[in-house]
């Protein structure tokens, strides 16, 4: 009998070389290259760049059925999803991604950033390392599959819009898809990841091991930390992540980490699978993900550019004081910092306005603001600035609170690879 289960043969795991640099409170040793990033989820050409899972055994392959479907289940996509429970909605917002790199194939996951069912259009967020390889470059063909429609006949062609190795985020675009028109594809709802607390319950949903959509559950272990990793192009990157203990595997890359309401709190990106470590997965926080997706679509869609554009104030900041606060609503504790300016770059837009020693209390860009209690509140927020944007900082200087305003110029914009 013909095996109707696989579109591609099992392929071995292409592993992106990744090293985590521990904080000074730990041993400070690097980890083997299999330990952290899901190197394109699954694999390419059986290349194995280090110790770890057997590339021909448990490494994730693409388990897309090869059924020759040419129609849709009666009424598919026509019912209201209002009655769908929060957990099940995550299956409608998460997708399987299969990439072809020449004669090689690899798989991962993604989430719907936006969906236009009438026209069959959508934007999808995934990890940059899902669609890019140091050896092969950008995937020459990207296919997307929906939950319950993971067969070759339902493949949806997707286009790379833009992305960033540094942030490990990419945006894909789908246009005029009959599958989307006849599906329950649903755009994700973003939670405020700045309000995520340790012990919060989470669900990881994605294409684990390339075997199709699945879900696991766990809790948040660390709400925000920074990993030093070797990215998709071989360069060293610093990636801000949250840590969680839900089981994730090769193929989960780019998939969603959700809260109990089915809202996105992060994009699953990495894990630690060393022999003496259990249940340490990492996701890029949803607040950062949304800012990156907006930036990429604004600067890259239907343009020659495919890189993130980031405005730089030209100031160096540090956490001069750190501590804890108690959330009055939940009773949870969370970390806070005093964010202090320690250096100002010559010729920057902040020169002559911001001073060394200023404590940044809040930042506003074009009238949209936020309180600053962590350093990343400033650095991440700058992704929303455009040429001509007005930035207002409220700072404490000499015991007084003052507002400082300046405008983003073209010279302040840098391309982030």
Model-flagged regions — what are they?
Residues 2-58, 263, 291, 298-417:
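C-terminal recognition in membrane/secretory proteostasis and scaffolding
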Residues 28-34, 102-107, 128-139, 179-187, ...:
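Active-site loop architecture of trypsin-fold serine endopeptidases
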Residues 30, 65-86, 139, 208, ...:
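C-terminal cap/linker of serine protease catalytic domains
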Residues 32-34, 115, 119-167, 176-177:
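Catalytic-histidine neighborhood of serine endopeptidases
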Residues 78-84, 96-125, 153-159, 187-189, ...:
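A conserved glycine-rich beta-strand in the N-terminal activation segment of trypsin-fold
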Residues 86, 112-114, 134-135, 159-161, ...:
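Active-site substrate-binding loop(s) of clan PA
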Residues 95-97, 110, 122, 126, ...:
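Terminal peptide-recognition signature
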Residues 151, 163-167, 178-181, 223-242, ...:
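Gly/Ser-enriched beta-turn/beta-hairpin loop segments
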